[in-house]
């Protein structure tokens, strides 16, 4: 029997029995963890209020087998709020749908429980903080998060040099299968020709150039979002359910 303590973001919850929940948390040190939180569905449970999606929490787990992941679900025995990001997200539809897509993305990229994913965790914390504060348009924050999640998981798209031969850009064509922009010599079936403004926007979102991103016209934002969605779908092998609800 062992106790484990970690920081984490609550990704989702599901009912268990009459009063309990299974909590899925992306933690800093142990990756994605599922744990049982007892009694949290009772009306007066302050413990349960801290374990809602979007919450950044300091949690304690009790594992009977001595390992946090492997022999049945551990118990979540204690939680303290670090930052209640949900308060600045759930009341606004655009923020809520963008945030839900961010949580789903983080879970999809951490499909092996118990494997540390520190970069993904830090991206999620930063993304939810920015979203809750309303620092930029929700759909831009989401696209930046999606691009950076792809990058930290080894799928960074190229928006300048040819993704196949490395020919210096700018290059005209874009292929999700090839890994981003490609030159005329490397053009493959299914390539598209996005606007230069859309590619500039995506490059800015990936690098954190918010001045450029915030100034982009709505039509180029929609175009860029379509490219991000297609690229993410290709690498995850299926789309995100929550993306269909995001307002662009």
Swiss-Prot record:
Involved in DNA repair and RecF pathway recombination. The gene is recO. InterPro entries: ARFGAP/RecO, DNA_rep/recomb_RecO_N, NA-bd_OB-fold, RecO, RecO_C. It comes from the Bacteria. This is DNA repair protein RecO. PANTHER family: DNA REPAIR PROTEIN RECO (PTHR33991:SF1). Keywords: DNA damage, DNA recombination, DNA repair. Belongs to the RecO family. Signal peptide: none annotated. One of its GO terms (cellular component) is bacterial nucleoid. The keyword Methyltransferase does not apply. The keyword DNA repair applies. One of its GO terms (biological process) is double-strand break repair.
């Amino acid at each position: 029997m062992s106790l484990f303590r970690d920081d984490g973001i609550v990704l989702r919850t599901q009912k268990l029995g009459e009063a309990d929940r299974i909590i899925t948390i992306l933690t800093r040190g142990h990756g994605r963890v599922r744990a049982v939180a007892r009694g949290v569905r009772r009306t007066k449970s302050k413990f349960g209020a801290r374990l809602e999606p979007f919450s950044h929490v300091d949690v304690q787990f009790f594992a009977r087998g001595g390992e946090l992941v492997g022999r049945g679900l551990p118990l979540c025995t204690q939680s303290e709020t670090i930052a209640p990001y949900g308060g600045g997200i759930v009341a606004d539809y655009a923020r809520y749908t963008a945030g839900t897509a961010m949580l789903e993305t983080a879970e999809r990229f951490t499909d092996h429980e118990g494997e540390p994913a520190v970069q993904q965790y830090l991206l999620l914390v930063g993304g939810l903080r920015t979203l809750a504060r309303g620092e930029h348009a929700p759909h831009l924050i989401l696209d930046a998060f999606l691009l950076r999640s792809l990058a930290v998981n080894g799928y960074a798209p190229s928006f300048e040099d040819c993704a196949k031969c490395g020919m210096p850009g700018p290059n005209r064509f874009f292929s999700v299968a090839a890994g981003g922009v490609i030159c005329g010599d490397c053009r493959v079936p299914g390539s598209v020709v996005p606007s230069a403004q859309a590619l500039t926007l995506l490059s800015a979102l990936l690098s954190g150039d918010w001045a450029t991103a915030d100034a982009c016209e709505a039509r180029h934002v929609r175009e860029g979002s379509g490219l991000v969605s297609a690229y993410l779908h290709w690498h995850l092998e299926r789309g995100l359910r929550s993306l269909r609800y995001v307002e662009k």
